């Protein structure tokens, strides 16, 4: 059995987790998450400098609590991992420097983990997670991507968002409607009282330079603008803005776009399994629609556990365990952090000469 201490500080959650695996069974011993939502809500979004300072303040306490809850001493941990890319650079540095310092102090191997690979690995904690090739819809505040994962766990991005990620669009539309931050949960809550068919909002596409459209890619900026224009038109009439109806219509369109393009991509690449991960994967409308529409095409759907959809260290630990188990990968203690790094470049984090 391998035990990993994992740290996640890529954005506004300070998280430390102790995870382990025996064969193909992955277990969470502790997964402590300190959210900064209250600190950033008055600004309507994450303030990078504030987030980094809060990580510095919270991480020692979160680390102690994770070890205490797991009933383990740091000397008993086999490996230490942290998110190193992509994310907010100042925030990433807090977790990475802490992890590498602990490795040096306690003579432990270090693994720098790609944040998106962490999200993909959250599915390892679900029952009967897929062992063969599958398509992942990774949909969060910062990313909306379709990633093919092959039998050997090689990763290839097949689709992406060209502007706002789906989660970012939820936040911006939520702010536009006067809802609380973060926008995703706020929109989902109020949409329950609305009519999802009330407004016909656009499903934006990305033009292909060769002609037609990029059928696996996403654009949510136009949808956000359409909601803004709708609210402006209603305000000009002097009528009350039907916020529940707008929220429900927006939520429906986002879910339809994500589901339709995911299923199309899976069919075109002869993949019979779809995995949905990331913060927006917690949205109930998206979860139900994906299962319903995929079943019509004989496509199996695996959903990330609800408590592991948003950023957390357990998913980073799972990615580390998978690297150790199947690829025998470790990172140099000289490895730094990067604000941007594509998922196809994740293997570079384990090179003898670090990429950054």
Swiss-Prot record:
<dbReference type="InterPro" id="IPR043129">
    <property type="entry name" value="ATPase_NBD"/>
</dbReference>
<dbReference type="InterPro" id="IPR017861">
    <property type="entry name" value="KAE1/TsaD"/>
</dbReference>
<keyword id="KW-0819">tRNA processing</keyword>
<feature type="binding site">
    <location>
        <position position="171"/>
    </location>
    <ligand>
        <name>substrate</name>
    </ligand>
</feature>
<feature type="binding site">
    <location>
        <position position="311"/>
    </location>
    <ligand>
        <name>Fe cation</name>
    </ligand>
</feature>
<dbReference type="GO" id="GO:0061711">
    <property type="term" value="F:N(6)-L-threonylcarbamoyladenine synthase activity"/>
</dbReference>
<keyword id="KW-0808">Transferase</keyword>
<keyword id="KW-0408">Iron</keyword>
<protein>
    <recommendedName>
        <fullName>tRNA N6-adenosine threonylcarbamoyltransferase</fullName>
        <ecNumber>2.3.1.234</ecNumber>
    </recommendedName>
</protein>
<dbReference type="Pfam" id="PF00814">
    <property type="entry name" value="TsaD"/>
</dbReference>
<keyword id="KW-0012">Acyltransferase</keyword>
<comment type="similarity">
    <text>Belongs to the KAE1 / TsaD family.</text>
</comment>
<dbReference type="InterPro" id="IPR000905">
    <property type="entry name" value="Gcp-like_dom"/>
</dbReference>
<dbReference type="GO" id="GO:0002949">
    <property type="term" value="P:tRNA threonylcarbamoyladenosine modification"/>
</dbReference>
<keyword id="KW-0479">Metal-binding</keyword>
<feature type="binding site">
    <location>
        <position position="119"/>
    </location>
    <ligand>
        <name>Fe cation</name>
    </ligand>
</feature>
<feature type="binding site">
    <location>
        <position position="184"/>
    </location>
    <ligand>
        <name>substrate</name>
    </ligand>
</feature>
<dbReference type="GO" id="GO:0005506">
    <property type="term" value="F:iron ion binding"/>
</dbReference>
<feature type="binding site">
    <location>
        <position position="115"/>
    </location>
    <ligand>
        <name>Fe cation</name>
    </ligand>
</feature>
<keyword id="KW-0963">Cytoplasm</keyword>
<feature type="binding site">
    <location>
        <begin position="138"/>
        <end position="142"/>
    </location>
    <ligand>
        <name>substrate</name>
    </ligand>
</feature>
<feature type="binding site">
    <location>
        <position position="283"/>
    </location>
    <ligand>
        <name>substrate</name>
    </ligand>
</feature>
<comment type="function">
    <text>Required for the formation of a threonylcarbamoyl group on adenosine at position 37 (t(6)A37) in tRNAs that read codons beginning with adenine. Is involved in the transfer of the threonylcarbamoyl moiety of threonylcarbamoyl-AMP (TC-AMP) to the N6 group of A37, together with TsaE and TsaB. TsaD likely plays a direct catalytic role in this reaction.</text>
</comment>
<dbReference type="InterPro" id="IPR022450">
    <property type="entry name" value="TsaD"/>
</dbReference>
<dbReference type="GO" id="GO:0005737">
    <property type="term" value="C:cytoplasm"/>
</dbReference>
């Amino acid at each position: 059995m391998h035990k990993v201490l994992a740290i996640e500080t890529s954005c506004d959650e300070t998280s430390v987790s102790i995870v382990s695996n025996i064969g193909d069974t992955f277990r969470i011993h502790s997964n402590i998450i300190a959210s900064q939502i209250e600190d950033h809500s008055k600004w309507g979004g994450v303030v990078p400098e504030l987030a980094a300072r809060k990580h510095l303040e919270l991480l020692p306490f979160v680390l102690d609590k994770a070890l205490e809850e797991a009933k383990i001493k740091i000397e008993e941990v086999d490996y230490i991992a942290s998110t190193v890319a992509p994310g907010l650079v100042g925030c990433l540095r807090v977790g990475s420097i802490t992890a590498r310092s602990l490795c040096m102090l306690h003579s432990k191997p270090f693994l720098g983990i790609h944040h998106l690979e962490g999200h993909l690995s959250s599915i390892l904690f679900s029952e009967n997670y897929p062992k063969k090739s599958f398509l992942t819809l990774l949909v969060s505040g910062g990313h909306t991507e379709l990633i093919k994962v092959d039998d050997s766990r090689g990763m290839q991005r097949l689709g992406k968002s060209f502007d706002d990620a789906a989660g970012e669009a939820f936040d911006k539309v939520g702010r536009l409607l006067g809802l609380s931050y973060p926008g995703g949960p706020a929109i989902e809550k109020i949409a329950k009282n609305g009519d999802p068919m009330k407004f016909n909002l656009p499903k934006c596409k990305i033009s292909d330079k060769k002609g037609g459209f990029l059928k696996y890619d996403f654009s949510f900026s136009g949808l956000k603008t359409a909601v803004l224009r709708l609210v402006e038109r209603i305000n000009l009439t002097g009528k009350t803005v039907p916020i529940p109806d707008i929220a429900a219509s927006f939520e429906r369109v986002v879910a339809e776009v994500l589901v339709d393009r995911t299923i199309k991509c899976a069919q075109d690449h002869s993949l019979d399994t779809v995995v949905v991960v990331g913060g927006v994967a917690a949205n109930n409308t998206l979860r139900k629609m994906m299962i319903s529409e995929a079943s019509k095409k004989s496509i199996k759907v695996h959903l990330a556990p609800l408590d592991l959809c948003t950023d957390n260290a357990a998913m980073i630990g799972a990615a580390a365990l998978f690297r150790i188990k199947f690829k025998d990968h470790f990172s140099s203690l000289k490895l730094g952090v990067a604000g941007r790094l594509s998922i196809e470049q994740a293997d570079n984090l384990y090179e003898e000469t670090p990429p950054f």
